[in-house]
UniProtKB/Swiss-Prot annotation:
One of its GO terms (biological process) is double-strand break repair via homologous recombination. This is ATP-dependent helicase/nuclease subunit A. Belongs to the helicase family. AddA subfamily. Its cofactor is Mg(2+). One of its GO terms (molecular function) is double-stranded DNA binding. The keyword Zinc does not apply. The heterodimer acts as both an ATP-dependent DNA helicase and an ATP-dependent, dual-direction single-stranded exonuclease. Recognizes the chi site generating a DNA molecule suitable for the initiation of homologous recombination. The AddA nuclease domain is required for chi fragment generation; this subunit has the helicase and 3' -> 5' nuclease activities. InterPro entries: AddA, DNA_helicase_UvrD-like_C, DNA_helicase_UvrD/REP, P-loop_NTPase, PDDEXK-like_dom_sf, PDDEXK_AddAB-type, Restrct_endonuc-II-like, UvrD-like_ATP-bd. Keywords: ATP-binding, DNA damage, DNA repair, DNA-binding, Exonuclease, Helicase, Hydrolase, Isomerase, Nuclease, Nucleotide-binding. Residues 528-823 form the UvrD-like helicase C-terminal domain.
């Protein structure tokens, strides 16, 4: 029986003679539809199309192979039914010639067949990515050297503006970033020149009509709408009476003011700016709490009004931080720098192109650009037109089919346009994809290409037509309902770039039979009542704030150090064990399509999806392992950190250059040579100044025969003989052959195979061999260049990922990134790490790039040393932020839609109560069943978004109860959700129980040695386990210590001594008294957002950077802090915790006045001076024998808060923000005396004279405390 297609699928399969866009929702069977369309085109009708007359473009090589295989299978099955069909036989014969390919592969084919048209050597090859990166670095180095030699002033200003503080590396990175960005477009050089010319602006009037100005206006209107909505809500509450009427005096005119701002914006940016500068918010009328009926209503009204005020003030103070005249002047000022930068980029591009031609290599960017060069011509007026080659393709291809169209970029779109009849008679482009799954912005994918057609194509007969596939054949109804609820509530044109409405919603298409005796595995037929399927979507939240029934004193040191990743992994471990072995004795079942029945869940049915696996996956693997859960993480990282790869790379380093102590010690310590730590120490003691290699040569030459053992000399000779042999062979052997020779000659390949996880380790070594083989095909040769090649690979690609040895049917839980899961499906999906904040680091860069809006840069005045964002950068930054968050929304959609039967979500929050309050606040200020896009934009993580959405759900009581939310619910939704929060203490308890069990298991199996017959082996094992290092007393002495750590160590020592004295003096009756435990801070009062230590750090930062000319008045200090926030030196939240009154008190104190007097008289004032010095190790460890350790030094590092010069010497000052009780100043001084004395000693050495006075200044006490001389 054939596949039963839906009406929409039938249309997508059979519609012809038009450009057709198929918007295929997740799980809608788009690949099956695409294959069926191709099969019908090549086998049915009066004139079936030969398959080589179709161009099928897929996103990956794997997808192309799968497509070809599916088509081949379909033709073969048809031939079984009709063996005599000549049409089928012909299509099967033509299949290998068919253009079912990625865009890069198609471009390569075009170039190979037309190389003569672009003057390309036919012997070209595709350059290795790392090889190309090395060439780029060489070209950049030469380019910069040439520019420095020219002594060009504009170039020097460019380096000064963008090069970085210590080198020009940052400018290097900017050039590479620009180059990679512009190469994703069809006309890179012209794009660059056009966008640079936008800086050549002369008047305010020229701003109007700029694309980035329109985007800025869109961003502003979003803010104004939010402000207006908040004010109208505040008005509605106040108008209800209850004593809030006085607020209306302010609110009414402020609503009118925001409306006038909206009108002014519609009339142009200049009118809006003038109106904004005149906008003001008066002091809110005072309303006493005692006089109102509802205190919550008062707080909500006040909060809504204050939030709207902040929005308008942010527009005025941050977006328009300069006047429009200054904005125009700033852009004009940057024009020469941008022109110089674009010239550098174009010169780099030309040199790179020439170098590749010289080496006969192409990179992936070249494939698309050279293909386009072949496909286009220009007419007499310079307009683009198809070349003869392109016209031939237009005639050849009956249809061009593009899979995953939402991930196309602009240059690929241009190529498709050149080889198809999209814009001429007989249109023939078939595009299929889902814009909600466009998640490759980092590869310059442009979802707007899909959206433009999605909006303009029609759903009925037309030359440009669209068809919607909305039925999901993957997931259960429980999953579909959950997906629809979340994204109807959150996804919009603003965040997601598409309104998720009924038209976009998933419809149930999958048929999961009812669980009964007929469709369950035999062994479970008698347990039907005891079987479980599907269930609610689960949200599990880790509350990092902890459990209020536990104090910090009850947590051990290990527990204190546990981070949220480990704890979240434990939640997931518990959830997996609940699925695999429910405590109630039931069985969780999943439907197996191959069996056509329900079966018990297996580990391989479960996937853990993470936004990014780095720093997460390894921790998850370790933690889940303690639960006995088999798990595999496809991280794509960790390869270069494996012991086997590090060992071989260390060997290669010393073969290339043995004068590298770290690599030589690594090699000697490895199983290949088995040197011991004591032998290293003996070698080093022979000569402290020479390289180890030199010492080893001298040992072999017999210079130290009286000082070392024969065994050590024998080991050294063995090492040297092998090293000399390898160095000789490395000089003439190809690197890949040499590496395999090393594996064999050292027997290391066989050795790692006997280690735990040996198959994986050997596979990793084979990967290195294959990488060496790839290197041999590049233009670089020799061991030295191979090492550089590997080092560059580490930096540019991050890692190669461990070799994959896991089969698809291995029964393990898989951990993968959401990106890698795209196109896959799993019975159970656990979406982890949802509390991780969105990564917006790219938005902080000096230069932002946008395909449509151009270049966003700071205005930098090199001479005056000032820098601020241009208006254009504000616009581009806002647009990029919207695109980043829209992509995050789509990534979340991809994650949700991977689940077939069960979805479990986990995430962590710092403070559950505060998070729930924020979610409820966002929901309460949003109308209808949606969350206001402005509130969605405020979300910092997936968990924030999910939490906001669920406050409106009928199952969201748990969130609303904690967050005190008064919210209109969406009572019509069919999805079901369950919630559970986990406290830190609860998870620690679970782990301690596991540890106790493991310790018992180890204890019970600890008698194995006594059963061994080989006594020598037993003795050797015991000797190794009982080994004691001869300098054991020095092991606790660090090589490097900070002043703070040293101070703490002394305080602990004093505390311990005091404790012993107290214990000695206490009576036995006293000891029997119950110990009084300190009440945790979170039980006394709600935890502050910033710890005391963090606040202290912020205060120190302000004291370091504040302008000493502006510390007299509170307003001056407040303005200085605001500047630090604007420059992103402090976050807005950090700026709010700065106590400007305390800072003013310091500068008004006698000590502060002395500092200012020194500053104003031109004497030296230093702030935050870092230092490194050496002190005797005996200061740290007093029990060290001075005869042995007398000359041992420890490096001491610290930062001196401030010191200043007076007529008769220097004054040292250290700020403290600690809590201090009145009358306990002496104890406070003693606490820090050792620290201050160390600072004094250091300064005495630096200055060459004695520091005359030293002070502590307590911000808490608002007084200076003099440190007496010892």
């Amino acid at each position: 029986m054939g596949t039963k297609w839906t009406e929409e699928q039938e249309l997508a399969i059979n519609t012809r003679k038009c450009n057709l866009l198929v918007a295929a929702a997740a799980g809608s069977g788009k690949t099956a539809v695409l294959v069926e369309r191709i099969i019908k085109m090549i086998t049915e009708g009066e004139n079936p199309v030969d398959i080589d007359k179709l161009l099928v473009v897929t996103f990956t090589n794997a997808a192309a192979s799968e497509m070809r295989e599916r088509i081949g299978d379909a033709i073969s099955k048809a031939l079984e039914k009709d063996p005599s069909s000549e049409v089928l036989q012909r299509q099967l014969a033509l299949l290998n010639r068919a253009s079912i390919t990625t865009m890069h592969s198609f471009c390569l084919e075009v170039i190979k067949n037309n190389f003569h048209l672009i003057d390309l050597d036919p012997g070209f090859r595709i350059g290795d990515q790392t090889e190309c990166e090395l060439i780029k670095q060489d070209i950049l180095a030469d380019l910069f050297e040439d520019m420095y030699a020219k002594d060009d002033e504009c170039f020097k200003d460019l380096v000064e503006a963008y090069g970085g503080s210590k080198s020009d590396d940052n400018l290097n990175s900017i050039i590479l970033k620009f180059y990679n960005f512009i190469m994703s477009g069809p006309w890179p050089e012209s794009w660059l020149k056009d966008k640079v010319e936008e800086f050549n602006i002369n008047s305010i009037e020229e701003l109007e009509g700029k694309k980035w100005i329109e985007v800025l206006k869109e961003s502003i209107i979003l803010d104004l709408n939010n402000a207006y909505s908040m004010l109208t809500q505040a008005r509605d509450i106040a108008e209800m009476g209850g004593g809030l009427e006085p607020y209306l005096v302010n609110i009414y005119p402020e609503i009118i003011q925001v409306e006038e701002l909206r009108i002014a914006l519609s009339e142009g940016i200049v009118k809006f700016y003038n109106k904004l500068m005149g906008a003001s918010f008066g002091r809110l009328k005072s309303v006493r709490k005692a006089s109102v009926d509802d205190e919550k209503a008062l707080e909500k009204t006040k909060s809504l009004r204050d939030e709207s005020k902040k929005i308008i003030e942010n527009l005025r103070d941050n977006v328009f931080e300069t006047s429009l005249e200054e904005a125009v002047l700033g852009m004009k000022k940057m024009y020469p720098l941008m022109k110089c930068l674009s010239g550098l980029i174009i010169e780099f591009s030309n040199r790179y192109r020439d170098k590749k031609r010289e080496k006969d290599i192409l990179d992936f960017n070249d494939l698309e650009h050279l293909c386009l060069e072949i496909l286009i011509d220009k007419d007499e007026e310079g307009n683009i037109k198809p070349s003869q080659v392109a016209l031939e393709f237009k005639d050849k291809f009956e249809e061009v089919l593009v899979d995953e169209y939402q991930d196309s970029n602009t240059i690929q779109e241009t190529i498709v346009g050149m080889v198809s009849r999209r814009d001429v008679e007989n249109p023939n482009v078939f595009m299929v994809g889902d814009v909600k799954q466009s998640i490759y912005k980092f590869r310059q994918a442009n979802p707007e290409l899909f959206l433009e057609k999605y909006i303009n194509y029609r759903e009925f007969e037309d030359s440009n037509r669209k068809i919607m596939l909305y039925k999901n054949f993957r997931s259960r109804e429980e999953i579909i309902n959950g997906v629809n609820y979340i994204f109807k509530t959150l996804m919009s044109n603003t965040v997601g770039e598409l309104e998720y409405d009924e038209k976009e919603a998933l419809n149930l298409g999958a048929s999961y039979g009812e669980l009964n005796e007929e469709n369950v595995e035999k062994e479970y037929i008698d347990e039907i009542e005891n079987l479980k399927v599907a269930g609610d979507i689960e949200l599990n939240i880790l509350n990092k704030a902890g459990n209020k029934d536990y104090s910090d004193d009850e947590l051990g040191e290990e527990e204190e150090d546990l981070d949220s990743i480990q704890l979240e992994a434990r939640i997931i471990g518990k959830k997996i064990n609940e699925l695999m072995n429910p405590e109630d004795g039931s069985h969780y079942m999943v439907f197996d399509k191959d069996l056509g029945k329900y079966r018990k869940i297996k580990y391989k049915d479960i996937v853990i999806l993470l936004r990014a696996t780095k720093n997460w996956a390894d921790t998850f693997v370790d933690e889940l392992g303690t639960y006995g859960i088999p798990v595999y993480a496809d991280t794509g990282t960790g390869y270069f950190q494996t012991i086997e790869i590090r060992t071989i790379l260390a060997l290669l380093h010393i073969i290339d250059n043995p004068m590298q102590d770290i690599y030589i010690l690594s090699s000697l310590r490895s199983p290949i040579f088995s040197f011991t730590s004591e032998e290293f120490a003996d070698l080093r003691l022979l000569n402290k100044d020479k390289y180890f290699f030199e010492i080893i040569k001298e040992v072999v030459d017999g210079i130290y025969d009286e000082s070392i053992s024969k065994d050590l000399k024998g080991k050294c000779k063995y090492f040297l003989d092998y090293l000399n042999k390898w160095r000789e062979k490395a000089a003439y052997m190809p690197i890949d052959e040499f590496i395999w020779f090393l594996y064999s000659d050292t027997s290391y390949y066989g050795y790692v195979g006997t280690m735990p996880n040996g198959v994986q380790r050997q596979a990793n070594l084979r990967i290195l061999f294959q990488r060496a083989k790839q290197y041999e095909s590049t233009s670089f040769k020799g061991l030295f260049n191979f090492i550089n090649f590997i080092n560059k690979l580490k930096k540019s690609s991050g890692d190669m990922g461990s070799a994959k040895i896991l089969g698809e049917n291995e029964n393990v839980v898989r951990i993968m990134s959401i990106h890698k899961s795209k196109g896959l499906e799993f019975p159970v999906v656990i979406l982890g790490g949802t509390g991780k904040q969105f990564n917006k680091m790219d938005l902080r860069e000096d230069i932002l790039l946008h395909e449509t809006l151009g270049i966003g840069t700071n205005c930098i005045d090199v001479k005056k040393r000032i820098k601020y964002d241009t208006l254009q950068k504000h616009a581009i930054k806002k647009k990029c932020e919207l695109e980043v968050l829209s992509e995050e929304m789509r990534i979340l959609y991809v994650a949700f839609t991977r689940a077939k039967e069960k979805l479990i979500i986990t995430g962590a929050v710092s403070d559950l109560e505060k998070s729930c309050e924020n979610w409820c606040k966002a929901s309460a200020s949003s109308e209808d069943n949606r969350i206001n896009p402005g509130n969605v934009l405020k979300g910092k993580s997936y968990l924030d978004w999910i939490g906001m959405a669920l406050t409106k759900h009928k199952d969201g009581d748990a969130i609303r109860n904690v967050g005190n939310g008064d919210i209109t619910l969406n009572l019509d939704d069919k999805s079901n959700w369950s919630f559970k929060s986990f406290d830190r203490s609860e998870l620690l308890e679970t782990n301690n129980n596991k540890k106790e069990k493991n310790n018992i298991d180890i204890f019970e199996s600890n008698n194995w040695i006594e059963s061994k017959k080989d006594i020598k082996e037993v003795i050797e094992i015991r000797n190794r386990l009982g080994f004691k290092y001869k300098y054991i007393e020095s092991c606790n002495t660090p090589s490097n210590i900070s002043v703070t750590e040293l101070k703490r160590a002394h305080q602990e020592e004093e505390f311990m001594q005091e404790s012993y004295n107290i214990i000695d003096n206490e009576s036995s009756e006293e000891n029997k008294k119950e110990k009084i435990k300190r009440k945790p801070r979170f039980m006394e009062e709600r935890q502050e957002e910033f710890s005391a230590a963090k606040k202290g750090t912020i205060t120190h930062f302000v004291m370091q950077h504040i302008d000493l000319d502006k510390v007299t008045y509170i307003d001056e200090i407040r303005e200085e802090v605001l500047k630090m926030v604007k420059k992103e030196l402090l976050t807005e939240e950090e700026g709010k915790v700065v106590n400007v009154f305390k800072i003013q008190k310091f500068f008004k104190s006698e000590l502060g006045q002395r500092m200012l007097s020194s500053y104003k008289s031109g004497k030296k004032v230093y702030r935050e001076l870092p230092f490194i010095t050496e002190i005797p190790s005996s200061i740290i460890e007093k029990n060290l024998d001075p005869k042995i350790y007398g000359e041992e030094k420890v490096r001491l590092q610290g930062i001196i808060d401030a010191f200043f010069e007076e007529e008769d010497g220097y004054v040292l000052l250290d700020y403290k923000t600690d809590y201090v009780k009145e009358g306990e100043e002496e104890a406070f001084i003693n606490k820090y005396k050792i620290q201050i004395n160390l600072y004094k000693d250091t300064l005495n050495k630096i200055l060459g004279e004695e520091v005359k006075e030293a002070y502590l200044y307590s911000f808490y006490l608002e007084k200076e405390l003099k440190i007496s001389k010892e």
